[in-house]
Amino acid sequence: MIAPIHDLHRSNLLTYSALGLAIAAVATAVNAGDFAAAGALLAAAALADTFDGRFARRFSRTERQRAIGAQLDSLVDAIVFGLTPVVVLNALPGERGGLMETVWWASAFGYALATVTRLSFYNVEQDDLRFVGVPMPAIALIWSTCLLWPVSWHIVPIIFVACAGAMVAPFVIPRPRGAAFAAFALWGVSLVTVHVVRLIF
């Protein structure tokens, strides 16, 4: 008998890591109000997702293991890029209540909806040469960049709407390769570094 535990595979280590980093980001933001740590963890999760496909392809896998890996990646992305930013950003300081809170949660829903819509799109459409709309790891790095400053809870809906639109917009972005890919990775590493320095000093 095949059980879910049999589908645990080392090729998915970076995907599991992204999930763990996202949970840690929630814990640091909600329990400790530490947004430098949350920003570092979000950037690290984005980097883990960026490299998880390359990492997985280094292993010899059966067709089932490849299919499980693809499903796992999509499910984890929904948590890491759809749910985690909402929970982290809701922990930001700011007076709640009234119409503003309704607007906040409506925009959060729109953002989460755009996230899962994008994931569903890429579960069906496979394109190794380009992205349609802004990829979610880049959105996570935008959130991490925002957390470099004392962001107010009240301006988050504007960023939610902008990021949601960017994820599902019908414009084409070539998949970064070479120098472009290195620049993207450097953005993520730089964010982790800056946030960690803020934590120390």
Task: List the predicted regions and their residue ranges.
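C-terminal membrane-associated helical module and adjoining short loops/tails
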Residues: 127-201
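Short, amphipathic, aromatic/basic-enriched membrane-interface segments that mark the entry/exit
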Residues: 3-13, 69-72, 124-132, 154, ...
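Structural signal for membrane-spanning alpha-helices in multi-pass inner-membrane proteins
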Residues: 22-29, 85-91, 115-121, 143-147, ...
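Topogenic membrane-insertion module of multi-pass membrane proteins
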Residues: 1-53, 169-171, 175-190, 194-201
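C-terminal ends of transmembrane helices
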Residues: 2-3, 54-66, 114-128, 165-175
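Multi-pass membrane catalytic core of lipid/isoprenoid biosynthesis enzymes
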Residues: 11-16, 58-117
